Amino acid sequence: MMARVTFAHALRSEAARLRRSPLVWRHAVLATVLGGLAGAYFAFSAWDSLMGTDAFFQLLGAGAPLLAGISCGLAADAEQRAGEAANLLGVSSRRSALAAKIVALLGLGLAAAAWAAVLFCAALALAGRPMPELPALALAVLGIALGSACSYAIFLIVALKWGRNASIGLGALGFIAAMALLGGLANGLVTGTFSGALGAEAAALVPFAWPSRLATLPLEASIASAMGAAGQARALASAWTTVALACVVATAVVAAAVLACANRFEGRRGGE
C-alpha cells in the first residue's frame, strides 16, 4: 500500500527541490535589479519619495500576476519534463502535493517582493529621503502575497492542464489589467493623487488587481495620515478592507475548489 503524503512532508520536499531550482536565482536577480535600480532612481530624483514609494509598490503588485504566471508555468514545465508531473499527480495525496507546490511558489514570490522592497527602502534611507512608516511597508509586502495566492492556485492548474504559455499569457493579461485599473503606470506619482483608491470597488472584483491594491492602499493611508488628511486616510483604509475581504473570501473558495477537484484532475499527456 502506498504511504500517504502529508502536506508537511510535501512542503519539505518542495523546499528541498526549490534550492536546486533556477527559479530561486531568477527571482533573486529580478528582485535585486528592480529594487536596486528603482531605489537608486527615487533616492536622487526630484520626485516626491513618498509617492515614489507608492508607485514602486504599485509596480511590484501589478507585476505579481505576471511573476505568478511565469513561476507556475516554468514549475509545471519542469514537473512535466521530470516525469509527466508524477511528483504532483502521481502521489497518494494530490491535495497535499498541489497545496505544497502552490505555497512554495507563493513563498518564493513573497521573498522576492520583500527583498526588492528592502533594497528600495535601503536606497531611500541612505539618501535621507522620507518613506512611509515601517508597519505600512510591511503590510504592503504582505498584501502582495495575500493578493497573489489566488493567482498562484489558478495559474498552476492552468499550466499543468494547458502548458507554460497559457499560464504566462494569463499572467501578462493580469499585469495589463492591474495597471489599467490603476489608471496606468505611475499615475498617482505623475498626478500627485492617491490612485490606489481609483475604482477600488471594481478592483475588489478582479483577482489580478488585488496585489497592487493591497500593496498601495496601506501606503497611501499612511501618507495621507502623515499629511493630516484624516478623512482621506480613513477612506483609503476602508478601501483596503473592502479589497482584502473580497480577496480572502474568493481565495478561500478557489483553494477549496482546487483541493476538492485535485483527485479528479488530469494534466497533460506526454505528447500534448
What are these regions (language model features)?
Residues 1-61, 67, 228-272:
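Hydrophobic alpha-helical transmembrane segments
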Residues 25, 95, 165-166:
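Residues that define the loop-to-transmembrane-helix transition and helix capping
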Residues 28, 98, 168-169:
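Hydrophobic/aromatic positions within or immediately flanking transmembrane alpha-helices
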Residues 30-34, 104, 171-178:
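Transmembrane alpha-helical core residues of multi-pass small-molecule transporters
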Residues 33-68, 72, 102-166, 232-241:
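Secretory targeting signals
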Residues 47, 168, 174-272:
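Terminal transmembrane helical anchor/hairpin motif
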Residues 71-110:
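Helix-loop-helix units of permease transmembrane domains in multi-pass membrane transporters
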